[in-house]
Amino acid sequence: MKLSKKISLTALLLAPALYSSGAGFQIQEQGASNMGTAMAGAVTNANNDATAAFANPSALSFLNKGDKNTVISISGAAVLPTLAYKGNDGRVADCAVNSYVPNFFAAHKFNDRITASMSITAPYGLESKYDKNWQGNAQGIHSYLMTADFNPSVSLKITDWLSVSGGLSAQFAYVKLTQNAPYEKMSGDSWGIGGNIGITIQYADEGRIGFSWRSSVHHEFSGDAHSKSAYAPILGNPDIEAEVDIPHTFTVGVYQRLPDLFDRFAIMADYTYTMWSSFDELKVSGLAAPFSEKEDWKDTSRISLGLHYYPKFDENLTLRIGSAFDESPVKTVNRTVRIPCGDRVWFSTGAGYKYGAFTFDAGYSYIMVVGNTDINKGGVNGHYYGHIHVISAQITYEF
């Protein structure tokens, strides 16, 4: 498959962005420890674990594990959405599909200055599936996107209060689309390369500021289209291609353990800017007739706030709450059945418990879809509604 670089990967593939946990088709589920605060504190490694290998490897320079030099965190999240289209005529079409998102993170301190890390994550994806006879089946029935991102990084502690990091991402992506159309199925895969840079400033013993940039990843999908048997003699099953650029993201955050009477609390906040505006058109080449679709996405902001509580009765326990607002990149006029994206509001809670060399974390988020989710495209006239439950668990081992 081949989408032009101006395209939204979303358009070509998506699991309804409405139910990917981040804006567009971005997945915001990198670590159960971060899930408890709606991902606030991820860029400053507020949880003192290996999940910063994805969010901001430079923060790993300030890992506090005593004489332990290696930390491994493994997490998984169950995404349980409710998503449906309701037409102005009253007809309802469900398209939600439950999914599981795994993640792996590791960090090793070679000395006081150099730390290496590795993350294996699924930063983009999800899935939607309508009944094959629903009224918009010509526009989409099954949409599936899977990504796997392999991201080694190295961080350098320049001074006692400043660290920087750099890394490379090798990202695999696979997409499959089905629809009630002459070409009833299209699929393709791609490998792309990206990079990441991080900066962390520890301005106090219990205070940090973090910055992270993740580059765009360029994908050149190749695959094939399968035509219905009635059209096969004319259309065949051609090879198709599409070029897609995953957008740049910029994140800045702050973590602060409170002093004096409030020293059992820590507060944190993260802000992420995603440059979705580079996606304005979808093009697929190799088909019998040219195909393109206007996307015209906009850049988005995400802000999250979190709170940790460290109970006096048990020094090994951490309790977490958080909330976030995640802006949609999709304009109403360009909303499609494959990407019925809307703004989201997060409410999250979680806990962590340290037991010897192990730490166990659990997180839960309830994500509401808010704002305008109307659609008026090709006879599909109505709106989308729904919400998401995300349940995550994580184990961390240090040695």
State what each model feature region is.
Residues A53, F62, T70-S75:
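N-terminal low-complexity or amphipathic/hydrophobic leaders
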Residues M1-S21:
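Gram-negative bacterial Sec-dependent N-terminal signal peptides
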Residues T10-A11, M39, F62:
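Intrinsically disordered, low-complexity segments enriched in polar/charged small residues
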Residues T10-A11, G31-N34, T70:
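Short N-terminal leader segment in a subset of presequences, especially plant chloroplast
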Residues M39-V43, V71-P81:
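Short strand-turn segments of transmembrane beta-barrel domains in outer membranes
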Residues S21-A32, A38, A42, N48, ...:
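Outer-membrane beta-barrel porins/channels
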